[in-house]
A protein has these predicted regions:
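Active-site donor/metal-binding and catalytic loop motifs
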Residues: 134-144, 369-385
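Acidic donor-binding segment of Leloir-type glycosyltransferases
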Residues: 172-212
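A recurrent flexible, glycine/aromatic-enriched loop bordering the glycosyltransferase active site
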Residues: 306-333
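Short beta-strand-to-loop acidic/aromatic patch adjacent to the donor-nucleotide binding site
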Residues: 237-251
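Cell-envelope/extracellular polymer assembly enzymes that use nucleotide-activated donors
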Residues: 150-155, 189, 357
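Donor nucleotide-sugar recognition loop
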Residues: 330-332, 337, 342-360, 365-374, ...
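Conserved donor NDP-sugar-binding/catalytic core segment of glycosyltransferases
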Residues: 255-303
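Terminal low-complexity segments of carbohydrate-biosynthetic enzymes
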Residues: 1-119, 393-394, 398-601
Length: 601
């Protein structure tokens, strides 16, 4: 049975060769995926996409007796290997080797020893000058009775991200939906909720792609609409067994869907409720992993295996070490349909935290696997003041239901830390949004149920900082100062700096000594604003920015509002948290969502 295809770098997907194979000499690929190998040269496939995590396949699935099928020409030594993580590094072991020869491209099969574990892979060494590798696959044995029926319903929520969405749909059409040779053919349908209402429905809709207009009610509302459409399709016999929630601004290799499908098809009965999570890799640096599963930690998020360079073999092996997962973000998360019930839909919290809450509520076991991933725009490309309203508000909502130890005092600590962090950056509007988010949480679940989320979001967006072309701002952009500011925090670490900051409240108790500075919009630290009058917050991607200014009046106003909010927390937190804990079912039912999304009209 096919386990994993051996993948190639692809223009438009990922061109980082070392995620697929490693060789010292420059690689020469002909059209049609043929890798020419110079005599004496060795190619290793102990890589993120082209190795097999045997331990996970054995633990979670019925897969047994792994084998390798390769298309080769010329004379080559084929070496079957494994790697294990021992004492903080991976250790290579040779399991078997064989010399093969063919005058033209020929298919060869190789069996890994029974019981082979760890990360399985192979190496090729060219023994002639005309050697070539032309692809292949890993296979396994599995009894027919152990293969379960699986059909995946892809749930995409989009808001004006046409290039990404259209590209991913086109790839799914050509590789799967309209490709009868694909194992996933007839086992995949795509459901798109168009929150921006800008897609061409007549052009996109078909028997297997379903695009519907939706109100702009954030990711929570968009993904929930997709779930509702999938439940409706199942009533008409669609037979979807798993809902794959997937962001609209990702790049997807469709083989990831096939690996997910195979994993689910072979899963053991005791893992019927397993979630499959895809890792997030950076779109701008495609070998760098942002997250591979995560823990909530009462809002102090822990992104597992963050910043792993997956071209490093030791990190590929370490990436498969299992940790305690509480959720997987919804850039790629596959959920059993048994979980997606009419009485168990997401919370209507618009954005930031809907995936976390749903995972905390439902994810008993999350499986991640090397090679199951998407490439996503880095978060530093997405600065928005509006997030300051949602992040802390939704943290409070999520903790009310899932972390009873998070009390009024814990919230006051978080509020003070975040508000003063923004005030010390002169970002007073962000501080206001943090406070407003907490005050809205304190109104309890009735407020959430009755609020027009789309109108509220427009108001929040209008209030925050808006980036403008820098030539329209009164602080000129200076690249040398921008570069200095990105390193300023590192240069000024130490006891003297810390004492200076504390004694002067980050410079508020002493006069400014610099007229202005230029900082990174996303990565600015409070120390960047130390004794500066004006700050240009600059985004290098858009080459836009906004200016904030030191103001003791604004400082005092924000501190007063924060202290007033803390008093409100003392008197209102317990009742608000209790309302979410006891009545959350009211806002995650199908009846509620139909009304919320105006689907009853």
């Amino acid at each position: 049975m096919l386990l994993q295809k051996l993948l190639w770098p692809r223009v438009g997907i990922c061109t980082e060769d070392r995620l697929y194979y490693r060789m010292k000499a420059p690689s020469f690929r002909d059209e049609g995926d043929i890798l020419r190998i110079e005599q004496g040269e060795r190619v290793c496939f102990d890589t993120y996409f082209n190795s097999v995590s045997a331990d996970k396949w054995r633990r979670y699935t019925a897969a047994q007796n792994f084998s390798l099928r390769l298309k080769l020409s010329g004379k080559l030594r084929v070496v079957l290997c494994s790697r294990h993580f021992i004492n903080s590094q991976s250790v290579r072991a040779v399991l078997a080797e064989k010399v093969v020869q063919a005058d033209s491209v020929q298919e060869f099969c190789f069996d890994f020893p029974k019981g082979a574990d760890g990360m399985l892979f192979f190496e090729l060494q060219a023994l002639s000058g005309n050697a070539a590798y032309c692809g292949g696959a890993y296979e396994c044995d599995a009894a027919e009775k152990d293969v379960q029926p699986v059909k995946i319903g892809v749930d995409i929520c989009t808001f004006r991200r046409e290039p990404f969405v259209m590209g991913n749909i086109a790839r799914m059409r050509s590789d799967i939906l309209e490709n009868a040779a694909s194992p996933l053919h007839n086992h995949l349908e795509v459901f798109v909720s168009d929150n921006g209402q800008t897609l061409d429905y007549d052009k996109l809709n078909s028997d297997t792609v379903h695009v519907v207009p939706n109100a702009n009610v954030g990711g929570a509302g968009g993904f929930t609409r997709g779930m509702i459409e999938i439940l409706k399709a199942n009533e008409n016999g669609a037979g979807v067994t798993h809902v794959l929630v997937m962001d609209d601004d990702i790049v997807l290799d469709t083989d990831v869907l096939l690996r997910t499908y195979t994993l689910l098809s072979l899963r053991k009965p005791e893992y019927a409720d397993v979630f499959v999570g895809g890792a997030m890799l950076r779109l701008d640096r495609p070998n760098i992993q942002v997250e591979n599963g995560a823990a909530w930690n009462q809002g102090q998020l822990i992104s597992h295996k963050a910043n792993f360079d997956l071209t490093k073999v030791d990190l590929c092996v370490a990436n498969e070490l299992e940790e305690r997962h509480e959720y997987n973000a919804w850039w790629y998360c596959c959920i059993p349909i048994a979980v997606v019930r009419p009485d168990n839909l997401p919370m209507p919290i618009f954005i930031r935290g809907d995936d976390i809450e749903y995972g905390l509520r439902n994810c008993k076991r999350l499986v991640t696997l090397n090679g199951i991933c998407v490439w996503h725009e880095p978060f530093e490309s997405k600065y928005s003041s509006s997030m300051y309203y949602y992040i802390l508000r939704n943290q409070c909502i999520d903790n009310s239901m899932h972390c009873p130890g998070y009390d009024a005092n814990a919230l006051k600590v978080d509020l003070r830390s975040q508000v003063m962090g923004e005030v010390n950056r002169y970002r007073y509007k962000n501080a206001d949004l943090l406070i407003r988010g907490v005050r809205d949480f304190l109104k309890g679940i009735d407020w959430l149920e009755q609020t027009d989320a789309e109108a509220l979001h427009k108001e929040i967006m209008a209030y925050g900082y808006k980036a403008q072309p820098v030539d329209q701002l009164d602080v000129p952009f200076d690249y040398s100062r921008y570069l200095y500011a990105t390193k300023e925090e590192e240069k000024n670490k130490g006891k003297l700096k810390n004492l200076k900051v504390k004694l002067t409240r980050n410079g508020w108790l002493v006069p400014p000594t610099r007229e202005n500075t230029v900082v990174s919009m996303m990565h600015m630290t409070a120390y960047n604003a130390y004794r500066v009058q004006k700050v240009l917050n600059y985004d290098s991607n858009s080459q836009k920015g906004f200016v904030t200014e030191r103001s003791k009046e604004e400082y005092s106003r924000c501190v007063r509002e924060m202290k007033a909010c803390m008093k409100e927390i003392d008197t209102q937190f317990d009742a608000a948290a209790q309302s979410y804990r006891e009545r959350c079912g009211e806002v995650r039912s199908l009846d509620f969502w139909k009304k919320y999304l105006n689907l009853d009209k």
